[in-house]
């Protein structure tokens, strides 16, 4: 959703920092919402039309996760995030803002990176994973394994309910 909670305004500023630091990256935002026009305007003002892409609502987000080296979940507040769980399932290295819901799903430095919700912290976390492929691989693998644990927990709960 393109709304205030998701902090895409801050994400756009983080992408500008990444580009200005000389990195080539693409950031896809899926979905629709009330902030689309203001976000598109900001992207254009910062010259990020080729780097920050908003294809709109898609019926299947998994191809986007699958091609992503890094999944970024920078939100102002969050409950349990299905998007984080989907990214873990597909083994994405995750960068997420350090808020309650995200903190419950990610162990910083192990299966993802938690950062402050500001452009510098987000950009620095992303750049650290771009620069350190081994760190990115380890985080990605830990995220994938965490999903296996989730599946085991769900199976156990279903068995207990029968």
Regions found by a protein language model. Give the residues of each.
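Conserved acidic donor-binding segment of nucleotide-sugar-dependent glycosyltransferases
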Residues: 108-109, 113-119, 128-133
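A charged, aromatic-enriched C-terminal amphipathic alpha-helix characteristic of glycosyltransferases
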Residues: 114, 134-161
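Aromatic "clamp/platform" in nucleotide-sugar-dependent glycosyltransferases that forms part
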Residues: 57, 76
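A conserved mid-protein helix/loop that constitutes part of the nucleotide-sugar donor-binding site
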Residues: 1-17, 23, 34-40, 82
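A structural motif in glycosyltransferase catalytic domains
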Residues: 11-15, 27, 122, 157
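Short acidic/histidine- and often glycine-rich active-site loop of Leloir-type glycosyltransferases
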Residues: 86, 99-109, 113-114
């Amino acid at each position: 959703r393109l709304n205030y909670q998701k902090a895409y305004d801050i994400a756009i500023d983080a992408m500008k920092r990444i580009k200005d630091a000389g990195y080539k990256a693409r950031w896809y935002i899926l979905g629709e919402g009330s902030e689309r026009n203001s976000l598109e305007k900001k992207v254009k003002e910062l010259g990020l039309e080729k780097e920050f892409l908003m294809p709109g609502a898609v019926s299947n987000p998994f191809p986007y996760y699958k091609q992503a080296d890094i999944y970024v979940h920078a939100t102002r507040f969050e409950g349990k995030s299905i998007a984080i769980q989907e990214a873990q399932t597909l083994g994405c290295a995750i960068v997420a803002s350090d808020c309650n819901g995200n903190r419950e799903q990610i162990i910083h430095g192990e299966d993802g990176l938690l950062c402050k919700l500001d452009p510098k912290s987000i950009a620095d976390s992303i750049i650290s994973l771009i620069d350190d492929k081994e760190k990115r691989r380890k985080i990605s693998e830990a995220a994938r394994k965490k999903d296996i644990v989730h599946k085991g927990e769900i199976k156990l709960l279903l068995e207990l309910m029968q």
